[in-house]
Protein backbone atom coordinates (compact mmCIF):
# COMPACT_ATOMS: atom_id res chain seq x y z
CA UNK A 1 0.00 0.00 0.00
CA UNK A 2 1.55 3.29 -1.14
CA UNK A 3 1.86 5.79 1.72
CA UNK A 4 0.46 8.90 -0.04
CA UNK A 5 2.45 11.14 2.28
CA UNK A 6 1.36 14.30 0.46
CA UNK A 7 -2.11 13.79 1.93
CA UNK A 8 -1.10 12.17 5.21
CA UNK A 9 1.11 15.14 6.08
CA UNK A 10 -1.98 17.36 5.80
CA UNK A 11 -4.34 15.02 7.64
CA UNK A 12 -1.95 14.00 10.45
CA UNK A 13 -2.24 17.23 12.51
CA UNK A 14 -6.00 16.67 12.78
CA UNK A 15 -5.92 12.99 13.81
CA UNK A 16 -7.42 12.62 17.28
CA UNK A 17 -9.07 16.05 17.27
CA UNK A 18 -12.80 16.70 17.50
CA UNK A 19 -12.90 18.14 13.97
CA UNK A 20 -14.58 15.86 11.43
CA UNK A 21 -12.11 14.82 8.74
CA UNK A 22 -13.76 14.77 5.30
CA UNK A 23 -12.07 13.29 2.22
CA UNK A 24 -13.63 13.92 -1.18
CA UNK A 25 -12.66 13.11 -4.75
CA UNK A 26 -13.72 11.14 -7.80
CA UNK A 27 -14.91 7.59 -7.22
CA UNK A 28 -12.01 5.08 -6.85
CA UNK A 29 -9.28 7.71 -6.51
CA UNK A 30 -7.97 6.21 -3.27
CA UNK A 31 -10.15 7.68 -0.51
CA UNK A 32 -10.72 4.26 1.10
CA UNK A 33 -6.96 3.69 1.14
CA UNK A 34 -6.57 6.98 3.01
CA UNK A 35 -8.89 5.62 5.71
CA UNK A 36 -6.72 2.49 5.96
CA UNK A 37 -3.56 4.61 6.22
CA UNK A 38 -5.12 6.63 9.04
CA UNK A 39 -6.08 3.41 10.86
CA UNK A 40 -2.51 2.20 10.42
CA UNK A 41 -1.11 5.36 12.01
CA UNK A 42 -3.59 5.18 14.87
CA UNK A 43 -2.65 1.55 15.53
CA UNK A 44 1.06 2.41 15.49
CA UNK A 45 0.38 5.18 18.03
CA UNK A 46 -1.16 2.65 20.43
CA UNK A 47 -4.88 2.75 19.59
CA UNK A 48 -6.45 -0.72 19.54
CA UNK A 49 -8.27 -1.65 16.31
CA UNK A 50 -11.13 -2.81 18.54
CA UNK A 51 -11.93 0.90 18.95
CA UNK A 52 -12.54 1.27 15.19
CA UNK A 53 -16.02 1.21 13.64
CA UNK A 54 -15.78 1.08 9.83
CA UNK A 55 -18.64 1.12 7.34
CA UNK A 56 -18.50 1.27 3.55
CA UNK A 57 -21.98 2.27 2.44
CA UNK A 58 -21.51 0.71 -0.99
CA UNK A 59 -21.26 -2.69 0.70
CA UNK A 60 -24.65 -4.42 0.53
CA UNK A 61 -24.17 -5.81 4.04
CA UNK A 62 -24.83 -2.28 5.30
CA UNK A 63 -27.87 -1.64 3.11
CA UNK A 64 -30.03 -1.54 6.27
CA UNK A 65 -28.16 1.62 7.34
CA UNK A 66 -29.34 3.90 4.55
CA UNK A 67 -31.08 6.44 6.80
CA UNK A 68 -29.69 8.77 9.45
CA UNK A 69 -31.82 7.19 12.19
CA UNK A 70 -30.75 3.62 11.38
CA UNK A 71 -27.09 4.64 11.29
CA UNK A 72 -27.41 6.60 14.53
CA UNK A 73 -28.98 3.66 16.36
CA UNK A 74 -26.38 1.18 15.07
CA UNK A 75 -23.33 3.31 15.92
CA UNK A 76 -24.66 4.35 19.34
CA UNK A 77 -25.24 0.67 20.20
CA UNK A 78 -21.79 -0.43 19.01
CA UNK A 79 -20.04 2.48 20.73
CA UNK A 80 -21.61 1.49 24.07
CA UNK A 81 -20.48 -2.11 23.57
CA UNK A 82 -16.90 -1.01 22.84
CA UNK A 83 -16.62 1.56 25.64
CA UNK A 84 -14.14 4.43 25.72
CA UNK A 85 -13.19 6.51 22.71
CA UNK A 86 -14.28 5.17 19.32
CA UNK A 87 -12.93 5.97 15.86
CA UNK A 88 -15.60 6.17 13.17
CA UNK A 89 -14.75 5.57 9.50
CA UNK A 90 -17.60 6.10 7.03
CA UNK A 91 -16.86 5.45 3.34
CA UNK A 92 -19.13 6.99 0.64
CA UNK A 93 -21.34 8.60 3.29
CA UNK A 94 -23.52 10.32 0.68
CA UNK A 95 -25.40 7.02 0.26
CA UNK A 96 -27.10 7.68 3.64
CA UNK A 97 -30.14 9.96 3.57
CA UNK A 98 -29.70 12.97 5.90
CA UNK A 99 -26.35 11.60 7.05
CA UNK A 100 -25.18 15.03 8.24
CA UNK A 101 -27.71 14.92 11.10
CA UNK A 102 -26.31 11.77 12.67
CA UNK A 103 -22.68 12.77 12.08
CA UNK A 104 -23.28 15.95 14.07
CA UNK A 105 -25.08 13.93 16.74
CA UNK A 106 -22.07 11.59 17.08
CA UNK A 107 -19.76 14.56 17.41
CA UNK A 108 -21.86 15.98 20.24
CA UNK A 109 -22.88 12.83 22.13
CA UNK A 110 -20.02 10.34 21.70
CA UNK A 111 -16.34 10.36 22.65
CA UNK A 112 -15.24 9.85 19.07
CA UNK A 113 -12.90 10.75 16.22
CA UNK A 114 -14.74 10.89 12.87
CA UNK A 115 -13.48 10.32 9.31
CA UNK A 116 -15.78 10.33 6.29
CA UNK A 117 -15.36 10.08 2.52
CA UNK A 118 -17.64 11.03 -0.34
CA UNK A 119 -17.63 11.31 -4.12
CA UNK A 120 -19.40 14.64 -4.48
CA UNK A 121 -18.17 18.21 -4.08
CA UNK A 122 -21.55 19.23 -2.63
CA UNK A 123 -20.91 16.98 0.36
CA UNK A 124 -19.94 20.00 2.45
CA UNK A 125 -22.39 22.51 1.08
CA UNK A 126 -25.70 23.70 2.41
CA UNK A 127 -27.10 21.70 5.29
CA UNK A 128 -23.89 20.01 6.39
CA UNK A 129 -22.10 23.34 6.76
CA UNK A 130 -25.06 24.53 8.83
CA UNK A 131 -25.09 21.43 11.05
CA UNK A 132 -21.34 21.34 11.61
CA UNK A 133 -20.75 25.07 11.84
CA UNK A 134 -17.17 24.91 10.62
CA UNK A 135 -16.21 21.93 12.77
CA UNK A 136 -14.72 19.96 9.90
CA UNK A 137 -11.67 19.95 7.65
CA UNK A 138 -11.81 18.84 4.02
CA UNK A 139 -9.12 17.12 1.98
CA UNK A 140 -9.57 16.58 -1.76
CA UNK A 141 -7.91 13.31 -2.86
CA UNK A 142 -6.68 12.96 -6.44
CA UNK A 143 -5.60 9.97 -8.57
CA UNK A 144 -1.90 9.09 -8.46
CA UNK A 145 0.63 11.74 -9.35
CA UNK A 146 3.37 10.74 -11.78
CA UNK A 147 5.69 10.17 -8.81
CA UNK A 148 3.22 7.83 -7.10
CA UNK A 149 2.50 6.05 -10.37
CA UNK A 150 6.20 5.50 -11.06
CA UNK A 151 6.76 4.05 -7.59
CA UNK A 152 4.06 1.43 -8.17
CA UNK A 153 4.85 0.78 -11.83
CA UNK A 154 8.48 0.07 -10.98
CA UNK A 155 7.38 -2.45 -8.36
CA UNK A 156 5.87 -4.35 -11.33
CA UNK A 157 8.49 -3.44 -13.97
CA UNK A 158 11.70 -2.75 -11.97
CA UNK A 159 13.81 -1.98 -15.05
CA UNK A 160 11.45 0.67 -16.47
CA UNK A 161 13.19 3.98 -17.19
CA UNK A 162 11.64 7.31 -16.23
CA UNK A 163 10.79 7.81 -19.92
CA UNK A 164 9.05 4.41 -20.11
CA UNK A 165 7.14 5.11 -16.90
CA UNK A 166 5.94 8.45 -18.25
CA UNK A 167 4.93 6.91 -21.57
CA UNK A 168 2.78 4.42 -19.66
CA UNK A 169 1.38 7.16 -17.43
CA UNK A 170 0.28 9.16 -20.49
CA UNK A 171 -2.06 6.33 -21.48
CA UNK A 172 -2.93 4.61 -18.18
CA UNK A 173 -3.40 7.64 -15.94
CA UNK A 174 -3.34 7.51 -12.17
CA UNK A 175 -6.27 5.43 -10.94
CA UNK A 176 -4.85 3.32 -8.06
CA UNK A 177 -6.56 0.00 -8.84
CA UNK A 178 -4.71 -0.37 -12.14
CA UNK A 179 -1.67 -1.54 -10.17
CA UNK A 180 -3.71 -4.62 -9.16
CA UNK A 181 -4.14 -5.31 -12.88
CA UNK A 182 -0.36 -4.88 -13.33
CA UNK A 183 -1.16 -2.08 -15.77
CA UNK A 184 -2.05 -4.61 -18.48
CA UNK A 185 -3.60 -2.68 -21.37
CA UNK A 186 -6.90 -4.49 -22.02
CA UNK A 187 -7.96 -5.05 -18.38
CA UNK A 188 -6.94 -1.49 -17.47
CA UNK A 189 -8.99 -0.04 -20.29
CA UNK A 190 -12.00 -2.15 -19.32
CA UNK A 191 -11.71 -1.10 -15.67
CA UNK A 192 -11.49 2.60 -16.53
CA UNK A 193 -14.41 2.35 -18.93
CA UNK A 194 -16.54 0.68 -16.25
CA UNK A 195 -15.42 3.27 -13.69
CA UNK A 196 -16.45 6.06 -16.04
CA UNK A 197 -19.89 4.45 -16.49
CA UNK A 198 -20.23 4.14 -12.72
CA UNK A 199 -19.39 7.81 -12.13
CA UNK A 200 -21.80 8.82 -14.88
CA UNK A 201 -24.66 6.67 -13.60
CA UNK A 202 -24.29 6.82 -9.80
CA UNK A 203 -22.73 10.22 -9.20
CA UNK A 204 -24.28 12.26 -12.01
CA UNK A 205 -27.47 10.69 -13.43
CA UNK A 206 -28.85 9.14 -10.24
CA UNK A 207 -27.82 11.91 -7.86
CA UNK A 208 -29.22 14.70 -10.03
CA UNK A 209 -32.23 12.75 -11.35
CA UNK A 210 -31.24 13.36 -14.97
CA UNK A 211 -33.77 12.04 -17.46
CA UNK A 212 -32.09 12.93 -20.75
CA UNK A 213 -29.09 10.61 -20.38
CA UNK A 214 -28.31 10.79 -24.10
CA UNK A 215 -27.86 14.56 -23.87
CA UNK A 216 -25.61 14.17 -20.82
CA UNK A 217 -23.46 11.63 -22.68
CA UNK A 218 -23.08 13.98 -25.66
CA UNK A 219 -22.07 16.87 -23.43
CA UNK A 220 -19.55 14.72 -21.53
CA UNK A 221 -18.10 13.43 -24.82
CA UNK A 222 -17.69 17.01 -26.06
CA UNK A 223 -15.93 18.15 -22.88
CA UNK A 224 -13.66 15.07 -22.86
CA UNK A 225 -12.70 15.71 -26.48
CA UNK A 226 -11.98 19.35 -25.71
CA UNK A 227 -10.08 19.19 -22.41
CA UNK A 228 -7.83 22.19 -22.04
CA UNK A 229 -9.55 24.27 -24.73
CA UNK A 230 -11.76 27.27 -24.05
CA UNK A 231 -15.38 26.97 -25.03
CA UNK A 232 -18.71 28.41 -23.94
CA UNK A 233 -22.12 26.89 -23.31
CA UNK A 234 -23.32 28.82 -26.36
CA UNK A 235 -20.71 27.24 -28.63
CA UNK A 236 -21.59 23.79 -27.27
CA UNK A 237 -25.29 24.53 -27.87
CA UNK A 238 -24.46 25.35 -31.51
CA UNK A 239 -22.52 22.11 -31.82
CA UNK A 240 -25.48 20.13 -30.47
CA UNK A 241 -27.85 21.99 -32.80
CA UNK A 242 -25.80 20.67 -35.72
CA UNK A 243 -26.60 17.22 -34.33
CA UNK A 244 -30.32 18.09 -34.36
CA UNK A 245 -30.46 18.72 -30.60
CA UNK A 246 -31.83 22.07 -29.44
CA UNK A 247 -30.58 22.70 -25.90
CA UNK A 248 -30.56 25.86 -23.80
CA UNK A 249 -27.08 27.00 -22.67
CA UNK A 250 -28.36 26.99 -19.07
CA UNK A 251 -29.10 23.25 -19.31
CA UNK A 252 -25.61 22.62 -20.66
CA UNK A 253 -24.07 24.59 -17.79
CA UNK A 254 -26.10 22.62 -15.26
CA UNK A 255 -25.01 19.28 -16.73
CA UNK A 256 -21.36 20.32 -16.73
CA UNK A 257 -21.74 21.56 -13.14
CA UNK A 258 -23.06 18.12 -12.12
CA UNK A 259 -19.98 16.53 -13.73
CA UNK A 260 -17.70 18.88 -11.80
CA UNK A 261 -19.53 18.10 -8.55
CA UNK A 262 -18.82 14.40 -9.21
CA UNK A 263 -15.14 15.34 -9.71
CA UNK A 264 -15.18 14.06 -13.29
CA UNK A 265 -14.15 17.49 -14.56
CA UNK A 266 -12.46 20.53 -13.07
CA UNK A 267 -13.36 24.01 -14.27
CA UNK A 268 -10.58 26.59 -14.66
CA UNK A 269 -11.65 30.19 -14.95
CA UNK A 270 -9.82 32.78 -17.05
CA UNK A 271 -8.25 35.80 -15.37
CA UNK A 272 -7.41 39.16 -16.92
CA UNK A 273 -3.98 39.73 -15.41
CA UNK A 274 -3.90 43.41 -16.34
CA UNK A 275 -7.37 44.25 -15.03
CA UNK A 276 -6.97 41.67 -12.22
CA UNK A 277 -10.47 40.28 -12.68
CA UNK A 278 -12.01 36.89 -13.40
CA UNK A 279 -13.55 36.70 -16.87
CA UNK A 280 -17.15 35.54 -17.06
CA UNK A 281 -17.04 33.13 -20.00
CA UNK A 282 -15.00 30.64 -22.02
CA UNK A 283 -13.60 28.60 -19.16
CA UNK A 284 -11.40 25.56 -19.63
CA UNK A 285 -12.13 22.10 -18.28
CA UNK A 286 -9.75 19.29 -17.39
CA UNK A 287 -10.61 15.68 -16.65
CA UNK A 288 -9.91 14.12 -13.24
CA UNK A 289 -7.84 11.35 -14.79
CA UNK A 290 -6.42 11.37 -18.30
CA UNK A 291 -6.41 7.54 -18.29
CA UNK A 292 -10.22 7.64 -18.26
CA UNK A 293 -10.08 9.88 -21.35
CA UNK A 294 -7.86 7.37 -23.18
CA UNK A 295 -10.13 4.45 -22.23
CA UNK A 296 -13.38 6.18 -23.17
CA UNK A 297 -12.43 8.57 -25.97
CA UNK A 298 -8.90 7.63 -27.05
CA UNK A 299 -6.44 9.96 -28.72
CA UNK A 300 -4.21 10.89 -25.79
CA UNK A 301 -1.10 10.67 -27.96
CA UNK A 302 -2.78 12.57 -30.78
CA UNK A 303 -3.80 15.32 -28.33
CA UNK A 304 -0.61 15.09 -26.30
CA UNK A 305 -0.28 18.84 -25.82
CA UNK A 306 -3.67 18.93 -24.07
CA UNK A 307 -2.91 15.79 -22.05
CA UNK A 308 0.37 17.27 -20.81
CA UNK A 309 -1.61 20.35 -19.73
CA UNK A 310 -4.11 18.11 -17.95
CA UNK A 311 -1.34 16.29 -16.08
CA UNK A 312 0.36 19.53 -14.98
CA UNK A 313 -2.96 21.08 -13.92
CA UNK A 314 -3.79 18.15 -11.63
CA UNK A 315 -0.30 18.28 -10.14
CA UNK A 316 -0.78 21.96 -9.32
CA UNK A 317 -4.06 21.13 -7.55
CA UNK A 318 -2.42 18.28 -5.62
CA UNK A 319 0.15 20.68 -4.27
CA UNK A 320 -2.49 23.08 -3.02
CA UNK A 321 -2.47 25.81 -5.66
CA UNK A 322 -5.50 27.77 -6.79
CA UNK A 323 -5.25 27.90 -10.58
CA UNK A 324 -6.60 30.20 -13.28
CA UNK A 325 -5.84 30.69 -16.98
CA UNK A 326 -4.13 34.07 -17.42
CA UNK A 327 -4.81 36.55 -20.20
CA UNK A 328 -2.55 39.49 -20.98
CA UNK A 329 -3.69 41.39 -24.05
CA UNK A 330 -3.82 38.88 -26.89
CA UNK A 331 -1.59 36.36 -25.08
CA UNK A 332 -2.55 33.54 -22.75
CA UNK A 333 -0.67 31.91 -19.89
CA UNK A 334 -1.76 28.31 -19.33
CA UNK A 335 -1.68 28.39 -15.54
CA UNK A 336 -1.51 31.25 -13.05
CA UNK A 337 -1.08 29.58 -9.68
CA UNK A 338 -1.48 31.00 -6.19
CA UNK A 339 -0.86 29.41 -2.80
CA UNK A 340 -1.25 31.75 0.15
CA UNK A 341 0.06 34.72 -1.83
CA UNK A 342 2.97 32.87 -3.42
CA UNK A 343 2.54 32.88 -7.19
CA UNK A 344 3.79 30.62 -9.94
CA UNK A 345 3.29 30.81 -13.71
CA UNK A 346 3.40 27.72 -15.94
CA UNK A 347 3.31 27.34 -19.73
CA UNK A 348 2.92 23.77 -21.05
CA UNK A 349 3.78 22.65 -24.57
CA UNK A 350 4.65 19.37 -26.28
CA UNK A 351 7.98 20.32 -27.84
CA UNK A 352 9.85 23.57 -28.40
CA UNK A 353 10.47 22.39 -31.95
CA UNK A 354 10.56 25.71 -33.79
CA UNK A 355 11.56 29.31 -33.15
CA UNK A 356 7.90 30.24 -33.53
CA UNK A 357 6.91 27.88 -30.68
CA UNK A 358 9.78 29.11 -28.49
CA UNK A 359 8.75 32.74 -29.05
CA UNK A 360 5.09 31.96 -28.34
CA UNK A 361 5.69 30.03 -25.11
CA UNK A 362 8.36 32.29 -23.62
CA UNK A 363 6.75 35.43 -25.08
CA UNK A 364 3.55 34.80 -23.10
CA UNK A 365 5.43 36.27 -20.12
CA UNK A 366 6.48 39.51 -21.85
CA UNK A 367 4.02 41.71 -19.97
CA UNK A 368 4.40 39.98 -16.57
CA UNK A 369 6.60 42.28 -14.49
CA UNK A 370 6.64 40.56 -11.10
CA UNK A 371 9.45 38.34 -9.79
CA UNK A 372 7.48 35.16 -9.15
CA UNK A 373 8.80 31.96 -10.80
CA UNK A 374 7.88 31.48 -14.45
CA UNK A 375 8.16 28.09 -16.15
CA UNK A 376 7.91 26.66 -19.63
CA UNK A 377 7.38 22.89 -19.37
CA UNK A 378 7.79 20.49 -22.31
CA UNK A 379 9.06 17.05 -23.31
CA UNK A 380 12.35 18.49 -24.58
CA UNK A 381 15.40 16.97 -22.90
CA UNK A 382 17.66 20.03 -23.16
CA UNK A 383 17.41 23.07 -20.89
CA UNK A 384 16.26 26.04 -22.96
CA UNK A 385 15.81 28.54 -20.11
CA UNK A 386 16.14 32.20 -21.08
CA UNK A 387 15.47 35.72 -19.79
CA UNK A 388 14.86 34.49 -16.24
CA UNK A 389 12.18 32.06 -17.44
CA UNK A 390 12.92 28.48 -16.42
CA UNK A 391 12.50 25.63 -18.88
CA UNK A 392 11.95 22.15 -17.44
CA UNK A 393 11.34 18.72 -18.88
CA UNK A 394 7.83 17.78 -17.77
CA UNK A 395 9.00 14.64 -15.96
CA UNK A 396 11.50 16.64 -13.92
CA UNK A 397 8.86 19.29 -13.21
CA UNK A 398 6.36 16.72 -11.94
CA UNK A 399 8.94 14.95 -9.77
CA UNK A 400 10.47 18.11 -8.27
CA UNK A 401 9.91 18.45 -4.52
CA UNK A 402 9.28 22.17 -4.92
CA UNK A 403 9.22 24.86 -7.58
CA UNK A 404 11.05 28.11 -6.97
Language-model segments: what does each one mean?
Residues 23:
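Hydrophobic anchor at the beta1->P-loop junction of P-loop NTPases
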